[in-house]
Amino acid sequence: MTRGPQPLMAIHGAQEIASRRGVVLDKPVLKGSHYDFILFTAGCTVFVRVKRIRTHVSNPQEISSLFCEDVQQIRRIPKTAVISREIWVLSPWKTWQYFEIFDDRIVEIRYDGQAVLQEEKVPG
């Protein structure tokens, strides 16, 4: 069950960002699928789901609880070395956050698909 209408303006904005990364496929044939568009980059095909959010996500695992159904649906797409599954979220302040969906975890990434650096604990 969905909560509200599809975020068409957010999807359009996401496609503009994605076009800087590669070629975007957005066809009526994709309507009703588990993703909003497909992004073709050098060596990788990215399936992207776009969502709106009311707050900043401080922990990638929040995506799993906020968008449980979307995460489950996008995980149906096989994850391989050349296929990526991502959820992009837009806040009311027009800031984007990007998350790569693995089978066992969710990782925050940058707009270019690279992982956000995590803080390292320095011993002692």
Residue ranges and their predicted role:
Residues 32-34, 43-47, 80-83:
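Short connector loops at helix/strand junctions that flank enzyme active sites
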Residues 20-34, 38-42:
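Active-site metal-binding core of divalent-cation-utilizing nuclease and nuclease-like domains
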Residues 31, 53, 91-93:
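Short, solvent-exposed coil/turn elements at secondary-structure transition points
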Residues 58-81, 86:
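Short, charged, amphipathic alpha-helix that recurs within catalytic cores of restriction-modification
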Residues 1-28:
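Acidic-basic catalytic patches of nuclease active cores, encompassing PD-(D/E)XK
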